[in-house]
Design a protein with these regions (language model features):
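Glycine-rich flavin
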Residues: 1-38, 52
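A beta-strand-loop signature enriched in Asp, Gly, Thr, and Trp
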Residues: 147-206
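Short Gly/Thr-rich strand-loop-strand
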Residues: 10-15, 71-77
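Charged/polar positions within long, soluble alpha-helices
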Residues: 138, 142-145, 178-181, 185-188, ...
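Buried hydrophobic positions in well-ordered alpha/beta secondary-structure cores of metabolic enzymes
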Residues: 25-27, 88, 133, 176, ...
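Glycine-rich beta->alpha junctions and the first turn(s) of the following alpha-helix
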Residues: 76-173
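Alpha-helix capping/hinge segments and adjacent helical runs
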Residues: 207-230
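DPxDG-like acidic metal-binding loop motif
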Residues: 28-67
Length: 230
């Protein structure tokens, strides 16, 4: 059958109080991308005992239909992610639908679900960021042949400073993409052998995603600087 679609928030913004056979969960979480397309939600929660918070951090899983979805994703960009808040109040979650953050082991789903955290999402963020950067660069290159800026009669594409900028941006995007792919290949090979990538590779994947996002942002800002907002 099909893979159930899930969404959620890893941040421990909820409270889970032990109850007979499970937990009573309260909380409101943000940035639940894709929530309106999901069947299940996973929510980070702090365990509360005798009215006091503990240092125990778990994730609870429950049907999306059990949560209130708050229509508060009113943004200028990324509208398509639909990253609305969601909340629950005194929701009973069975013990079997909770798991500790640090010791979670994939039970099914193949190598994709053995990539681990944060590697599992790092490559998704990288792909989006690099795509935005590449689109910005391709757009200004496509317009440069006809664009004239300021009082100079020459086309933007013929100016050495513009050519240098485009070349540097292109190389930086390629380098960031190559690094992301290299690390993902290493992680994927381990996952295919039943191994969850360890802390070093997880850190490298996260760092590569941060680096790719930084490069993409630089490219977009350079595109605006070189061509203007129109």
């Amino acid at each position: 059958g099909s893979v159930p679609r899930s969404a959620g928030a890893f941040m421990p913004m909820g409270k889970a109080e032990p109850a007979d056979g499970g937990y009573l969960v309260d909380g409101r979480w943000s940035f639940a991308s894709g929530i309106r397309h999901s069947h299940w939600l996973s929510a980070g929660s702090i365990v509360v005992k005798d009215g006091k918070t503990t240092d125990e951090y778990i994730r609870v899983v429950f049907p999306t239909s059990e949560a209130v979805i708050h229509d508060n994703w009113d943004v200028a960009g990324l509208k398509g992610t639909g990253s609305c808040d969601f909340s629950v109040s005194d929701l009973f979650v069975p013990q079997g639908f909770s798991y500790p953050r640090a010791a979670a082991e994939p039970k099914r789903g193949g190598p994709l679900y053995r990539l681990g955290w944060p590697g599992f999402v790092a490559y998704e963020h990288s792909a989006f960021a690099l795509g935005v950067g590449r689109r910005a660069l391709d757009t200004i290159v496509g317009e440069a042949g006809a664009k004239i800026r300021g009082t100079q009669p020459s086309r933007l594409a013929s100016r050495p400073s513009f050519q240098k900028s485009v070349g540097e941006c292109d190389l930086r995007l390629r380098a960031a993409r190559a690094l992301v792919i290299q690390l993902l290949k290493e992680a994927w090979e381990q996952a295919n052998h039943g191994i969850i990538p360890g802390p070093q590779l997880q850190g490298e994947m996260r760092s590569s995603a941060t680096f790719a996002t930084s490069v993409a942002l630089d490219v977009v800002l350079e595109a605006v600087f070189r061509t203007g907002i129109r």
